[in-house]
Design a protein with these regions (language model features):
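Conserved HGGG/HGGXW glycine-rich cap/lid loop of the alpha/beta-hydrolase fold
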Residues: 12-90
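Gly/Ala-rich beta-loop-alpha elbow adjacent to hydrolase catalytic centers
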Residues: 123, 127, 131
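Alpha/beta-hydrolase
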Residues: 160-231
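Short beta-strand immediately N-terminal to the catalytic nucleophile in serine-hydrolase-like folds
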Residues: 103, 121-123, 148
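Flexible "cap/lid" loop of the alpha/beta hydrolase fold
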Residues: 132, 136, 143-174
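A domain-start/cap signature at the N-terminus of enzymes
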Residues: 1-11
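Residue in the alpha/beta-hydrolase core beta-strand immediately N-terminal to the catalytic nucleophile
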Residues: 63, 120, 144-146
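Conserved acidic catalytic loop of the alpha/beta-hydrolase fold
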Residues: 88-97, 101-119
Length: 233
């Protein structure tokens, strides 16, 4: 499939560096892909982006702050057991170096740099929460919203299992082999036996993510931002 494609670039947006990539023609309808917790823009597979672009969209994917080749920030530590218990049973969020609203502003600032007034927003998991923040705070910038495997933050909604929370929030490994093994394990859990598995594809995705650069401390900060977020309904 042949579509217009601009290689990754870095923009100064909201005071930080945001690495982004564009598929599709300049005059096409803009569509922004926002990845989830600790995820990188390349987890929106190239073929997926090309297919959307071939349908008449200008696809913008990017690394959130603290992931991939975007700016690495500072502050925040691994959540303590006490902090986790307060979140789980008292709905008291931990302190966070930045919020999902800050990450929403990153997205809007990137669109400003690109000269895009409004776009379709597509977010997965934490990315869906960011997309919701954009729709609430900057409604005039949103043509449509697609929220994938995400939440509004309402504590009355069904919650993830303790096992899922434990696996997804455990410290990110620094070694390549352990990172790949954890990546494959987590995606197997997220599929929950409902979607076909492709071990070779999962491995290639994990290798690409690791080789672009992982940031365990950044994942911890993103976890705090997610837990800090109040319900938007």
């Amino acid at each position: 499939m042949s579509v217009a494609h601009k290689p990754p670039r870095v923009a100064k947006a909201n005071g930080i560096d945001i690495c982004y990539e564009i598929f599709g023609e300049a005059g096409a309808e803009p569509l922004v892909l926002i990845m989830g917790l600790g995820g990188q823009m390349v987890q929106w597979d190239d073929a997926f982006c090309e297919q959307i672009a071939a349908r008449g969209f200008r696809v913008i994917r990017f690394d959130n702050r603290d992931t991939g080749q975007s700016s690495k920030l500072s502050g925040g530590k691994s959540l303590t057991l006490w902090e986790m218990l307060k979140v789980r049973f008292l709905n008291i969020p931990p302190a966070a170096p930045y919020t999902l609203r800050d990450m929403a502003q990153d997205t809007i600032s990137l669109l400003d740099v690109l000269g895009i007034r409004s776009a379709h927003m597509v977010g997965a998991s934490m990315g869906g929460m960011i997309a919701q923040e954009i729709a609430i705070t900057f409604p005039e910038r949103v043509r449509s919203l697609i929220s994938i495997m995400s939440t509004t933050g309402d504590p009355d909604l069904p919650q993830p299992s303790n096992k899922a929370v434990s696996l997804l929030t455990e410290p990110q490994p620094k070694s390549r082999d352990k990172f790949i093994a954890r990546f494959k394990r987590n995606w197997k859990m997220l599929r929950a036996g409902r979607f076909p598995e492709d071990e070779a594809l999962d491995r290639s995705r994990a290798e690409r993510v690791f080789d672009r650069g992982v940031n365990p401390a950044g994942v911890e900060r993103q976890i705090r931002a997610v837990l800090d977020r109040k319900s938007v309904v």
